[in-house]
Amino acid sequence: MFKIWPGLNLKAFLAAYFFLYSSACIANNAYATSSIVSHNANYTLSMGKKNSNASVQDVAGKISFTLNAQCDGWSLIEDYFFRFLYETGEEITIFSHSDSWEDRNGQLFSFDVRERNSYEPESIYTGYAILPPQSDMAEASYSGAYNDTLTLSTDIMFPVTYTRTIIDAAKQGRKFMSGKIFVNSTPEDAVKTASAAIGIRKPYESDIQINGVTTSYYWPVDIAYFKAGTTESIPEYQIQMDLHDNGVVTDFMINYGDFTVHASISDAQLIEKVDCM
């Protein structure tokens, strides 16, 4: 797996957006509560703060994210474009596309990922992760650029399941959550342990108001991601996000220690509901 800067691989960076919905350890019946809207959202990325140790001097890019409710589950499509400028003057561009699906019970997750950058050929891998009772055991299987099978713990959660769970926790007034998450990444980075802190609900007062997408309030949520099984006290990365009760994220910041990346919603629209009758 190539590196975009020392100590951090591409999928760890990309997963930091898509799996900012990832850290609870609550039963899958959480699926029956929070209502997440089908929507497409576009985000603009920019460099946040950096310290004297940061080799990356500037970041620019765009993210397009589509979450669509289907009769048997949820489809999720992500497109990323990043441009990194290093202190050496070197500029690197990265493109990534991910197409995934999660069943409505939160027990099956499939993914198809394509990545390329300015100095390596395209990498393509597909696979799935499955949990009981859909299967006798919890596991993830890969093909393509990676040919591997992982044994998972049964308390792993997938993205949409987690999104609903964390919103439910916020509505219940819970302040902290932790658990294991399966992230749509390479086998070595597939599972993360995350600790989330949920802040007090705040009014949404941005100039960007999108009918049906943005709501009148949000919760500030701070999630720290750790490599599974590690005893390290410092996370690999940390995310601060503004999460609305319909599952929409309007603003987030990824903190890698030496620097931060800021993303803000630029436009979005609702997707018409599927008739499952």
What are the functions of these language-model segments?
Residues 112-277:
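Mature, soluble, non-transmembrane domains
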